[in-house]
């Protein structure tokens, strides 16, 4: 859309278009937005970063919504609705096919069972859906997501709080090193 580029120098237009192309190479056609399609760590780590993290996907899809790429956004949100746990949260990360990915988060901390999640992934998915709505005003797409994504995730986020402080309960941090608030 030429409106996106009004008044911008050609060098910025080129960077914008190149950025969109690079983003698209990391997006599975079923909706998963992959952190990185690389194999650098396979040799030593026996794993890749070819996973969908809800946080990363939310930031990417928010930018794509602002750029007007609704078709990619809708696939991502449908993907999230499909993988959302029955209780309303996203796990740490998923394979592009929607299956739960290998996980290095413990399910037990100090002998107590915990959810191996990064709570912000669930919250940021709802935030990105709000950005999508603000950018594209596509309420017809959002309406069917109300019960199986929006309400379930919001109910989880409201319930996943300390009853005394009302702060969120602990979850794993951005770098997956600490389990805390």
PLM feature spans:
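Active-site-adjacent structural elements in folded domains
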Residues: 36-48, 110-112, 167-181
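Short loop/turn segments at secondary-structure transitions that flank enzyme active sites
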Residues: 25, 29, 86, 96, ...
